[in-house]
Amino acid sequence: MQFKRLSDLIARNELKGKRVFIRADLNVPQDGKGNITEDTRIRASVPAIRQALQAGAAVMVTSHLGRPVEGEFKPADTLAPIAQRLSELLGQPVALKQDWVDGVDVAPGQVVLLENCRVNKGEKKNDDVLAKKIAALCDVYVNDAFGTAHRAEATTHGIAKYATVACAGPLLAAELDALGKALHQPASPLVAIVAGSKVSTKLTILKTLADKVDNLIVGGGIANTFMLAAGLKIGKSLAEADLVGDARAIMDMMAKRGASVPIPVDVVCAKEFSPTAIATVKDVADVTDDDMILDIGPKTADILAKQISQAGTIVWNGPVGVFEFDQFANGTKTLAHAIAESSGFSVAGGGDTLAAIAKYDIADKIGYISTGGGAFLEFLEGKTLPAVEILEQRATS
């Protein structure tokens, strides 16, 4: 992928005295009183802001927060708590500016936070008139919000069409570099772990990866559907019988080119889905009609861990069992530690995956952890991300 980078502009001393507009992803969780409960995204946005300030730029930053109604600003929509947290992290004042579309006063070395961009009429529809107005505020546009890269909106796409210079910030660039390395130039063997409750929500990803990977490890309800496709009984486990044909087609397609979808040889079952359910390990042939499969078994986990240990590249999206309940967590824990200990390059993403990484304290052992939920999945699906595509177009025009 070819796109301009903020770091390149800084290296060429092209930001001094310039007005820089940064689209960040500051959409953080808050409690009922508006207090920020988790600030990872704010901390992740700091390098781009700090780099632009140190390069002598006048910096404007904006983000969406929640789902405001366009044209109707409410107190719950405000970025005020984020301005305060940014100020603490940067060690300098961060003023919050409302009604900013028609003009912003900011001097070199200063940073202002522009109020929730999704309150502006036309933001979500990528309105051209709005995009041109916002582009006129700056000399350089920086997209540093991978989490919204799959959306074509005025501050993610439209502005990039019209700004004098449009580039990727360090967070977006690192994300694209890592995902490109994993999917476009992977060291082999390439192993993907795709897990979740439904095949239907990840069918496109499964089909796309089936063309590329050497081993496609499936988990959760997705694995149950593949077990049905392999002719195994799954009791009363969550599965999608109408997608058994698709699962079988994916298995056949991969087998033809010498790749595989490893089907579990043993599973962890229970009679009910609850935190206190009694877990029983069974060979797959012994699953009964009243069993619910809630994790892969230890033999399966060891087989898969060995495949992961030999991988050159690993893409991880989803825990393979109900890891929130400890008695059904061994599969996810075993694979998580195998990924952490592998010498291969690993990329992980998706909310449940991030929770598993946190639970097993392996964040520093994953090659790259993706910050974008929907954008990460669409990248895995092979879809074009509008906010990235426009940066590529601008780089070549």
UniProtKB/Swiss-Prot annotation:
Presence of the UniProt keyword Signal in the record: no
Subcellular location: Cytoplasm
Oligomeric and partner information: Monomer.
One family name in Pfam for this protein: PGK
Keywords on record: ATP-binding, Cytoplasm, Glycolysis, Kinase, Nucleotide-binding, Transferase
Lineage, highest ranks first: Bacteria, Pseudomonadati, Pseudomonadota, Betaproteobacteria, Burkholderiales
Protein name: Phosphoglycerate kinase
Positions that bind ATP: 202, 324, 350-353
Organism: Herminiimonas arsenicoxydans
SUPFAM superfamilies: Phosphoglycerate kinase
One biological process term in Gene Ontology: glycolytic process
Family: Belongs to the phosphoglycerate kinase family.
Superkingdom of the source species: Bacteria
